[in-house]
Amino acid sequence: MLQHAPTLTRLVGELKKLPGIGERTALRLAFHLLKSPQNLGSLAEALTQVQERVCACSVCFALTEQNPCPICSGGRDSSVICVVETSQDMLALERSNAYHGSYHVLQGAISPLHGVNPDDLRIRELLMRIEQGKVEEVVIATNFTVEGETTALYLARQLKPLGIRVTRLAHGIPLGSDIEFVDPATVQWAMKGRSEL
């Protein structure tokens, strides 16, 4: 591609490793960065700082710069643990301002097709947290995908014998949507999960 510029070729190759970035977008980004050297320097500095400063919280395994993270060390309700797949999921829940307990980030979901087994996730650490503390409820907030559902079922089987309340995030028809436009699987889940008024 760029035989005369192996460094640029390497940059394009590294950018292509990012999710959603193909050859053309990587090339466009590389040339954009080269047009403004101050942006290139800022990006390089930010990447270096992230590599040096961001780590997994030793309690909940969320990405943080402070260990334990501000949520784990900030006096949140530790009797309820919300289990999520990723730090991004945790941030989405935090943005909603609907939950004020603690978290546990599994760092993935069970996916035999991709070689991810329960031992590859932070499930053992979750069980240890429950055994050590005064946990009354675990909210399973894994994604509503095949992998997320598999993980939720596995967690429920592991947690129920411990005598704590195990709940799952509700799922169904999104607020503000018309039923006629909702897919059949979502309508089925909504019917199964209906509640009394």
Swiss-Prot record:
GO molecular function, one term: DNA binding
Record keyword Iron present: no
CDD domains: TOPRIM_recR
Zinc finger (C4-type): 57-72
Cystine bridges: none
Signal peptide: none
Biological-process GO terms, alphabetical: DNA recombination; DNA repair
SUPFAM superfamilies named in the record: Recombination protein RecR
Keywords: DNA damage, DNA recombination, DNA repair, Metal-binding, Zinc, Zinc-finger
Segments forming domain Toprim: 79-174
Family according to the record: Belongs to the RecR family.
Function field: May play a role in DNA repair. It seems to be involved in an RecBC-independent recombinational process of DNA repair. It may act with RecF and RecO.
Protein name in the entry: Recombination protein RecR
Protein species of origin: Trichlorobacter lovleyi (strain ATCC BAA-1151 / DSM 17278 / SZ)
Gene name for this UniProt entry: recR
